[in-house]
């Protein structure tokens, strides 16, 4: 079964390589907006019924929520491919989280359904029974643990900043070198709150999605964006006028950058089942695939989201 997961990710990367030259539209609307399609049915396992001990939102289906605008973890595209999932309105979701969701659904004997949901709506959606789980590059912060239960991390990254390639910030070595500069993060995420670790920073009001943030950076409204490395790599691969800066240990942000899967508080049966599926894929396989997807320029992909 582990081989299925790795092969699916390899397929996603090959498809991306053939399409990453598509048009890049920085002003394209995000799939994570409130107007995003409400639901989708996806090609997952054809098994009927699945694990009888599991109760899911829709019997026989594993329904997950994600932004569908956070490449390389998840994004929206217009083409139907082997790894993509139909989300309605002639659009498809793809990315690491989608492949992960497919693999887990396969292990549970269920069919995968993906719902595009704005970031701030993900926790309410899992708690009100709209979705079974959140697979969206989400970090298990203490605050979130009060509202939902998390699996062990399925990927661990590190935090960087994205800057314009012609900026004098390309050679900085510490986050404190950003003092006095305009720095922006994503709304309601760790990537916004950590900005205050920079002394004297001009903490710009966060935006909801990276497509909007990239526009702000390219237009000069802000000097730098915070992001985790795979996302930054994807942004840079799609936007040759941008680059990202990594920091040595002790000079960067102090933050937990691991990501986990969330379920409704107290849904132990589903949590344990998902955890078991994750355990069947080695940490090495999980860690290697995200950077590979990012390197293929996944941020624009076929839909040109950034």
Please state what every model-predicted region is.
Residues 14-18:
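C-terminal motif of bacterial Sec signal peptides marking the signal peptidase cleavage site
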Residues 19-32:
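Bacterial lipoprotein signal-peptidase II cleavage site
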Residues 20, 98-107, 167, 181, ...:
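Extended ligand-binding regions for polar small-molecule ligands
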Residues 21, 48-52, 190-205, 244-247, ...:
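Ligand-binding clefts/hinges and TM-proximal coupling segments of bilobed small-molecule sensing domains
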Residues 49-137:
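Extracytoplasmic small-molecule ligand-binding "clamshell" domains
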Residues 106, 111-177, 254:
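Acidic, polar ligand-binding/catalytic clefts
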Residues 120-121, 137-147, 194-197, 211, ...:
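A ligand-binding cleft/hinge motif common to bilobed small-molecule-binding domains
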Residues 156-163, 237-278, 296-306:
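Periplasmic-binding protein-like
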């Amino acid at each position: 079964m582990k081989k299925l997961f790795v092969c699916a990710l390899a397929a996603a990367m090959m498809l991306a390589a053939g399409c990453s030259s598509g048009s890049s539209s920085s002003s394209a609307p995000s799939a994570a907006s409130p107007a995003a399609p409400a639901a989708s049915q996806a090609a997952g396992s054809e098994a009927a019924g699945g694990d009888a001990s599991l109760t899911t939102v829709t019997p026989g289906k594993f329904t997950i929520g994600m932004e569908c605008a956070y490449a390389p973890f998840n994004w929206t595209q217009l083409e139907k491919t082997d790894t993509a999932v139909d989300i309605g309105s002639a659009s498809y979701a793809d990315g690491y989280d989608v492949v992960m969701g497919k693999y887990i659904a396969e292990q549970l004997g269920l069919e995968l359904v993906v719902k595009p949901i704005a970031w701030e709506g993900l926790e309410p959606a899992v708690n009100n029974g709209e979705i079974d789980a959140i697979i969206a590059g989400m970090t298990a912060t203490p605050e979130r643990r009060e509202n939902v239960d998390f699996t062990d991390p399925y990927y661990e990254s590190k935090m960087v900043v994205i800057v314009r390639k012609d900026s004098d910030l390309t050679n900085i070595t510490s986050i404190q070198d950003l003092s006095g500069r305009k720095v922006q993060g994503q709304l309601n995420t760790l990537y916004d709150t950590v900005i205050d670790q920079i002394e004297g920073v001009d903490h710009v009001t966060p935006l909801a999605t990276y497509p909007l943030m990239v526009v702000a950076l390219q237009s000069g409204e802000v000097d730098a964006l915070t992001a985790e490395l795979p996302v930054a790599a994807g942004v840079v691969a799609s936007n040759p006028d941008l680059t990202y800066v990594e920091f040595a240990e002790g000079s960067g942000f102090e933050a937990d950058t691991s990501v986990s899967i969330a379920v409704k508080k107290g849904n132990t049966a589903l949590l344990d089942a998902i955890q078991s599926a994750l355990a069947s894929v080695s940490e090495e396989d999980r860690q290697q695939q995200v950077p590979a997807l990012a390197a293929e320029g996944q941020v624009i992909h076929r839909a040109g989201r950034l």
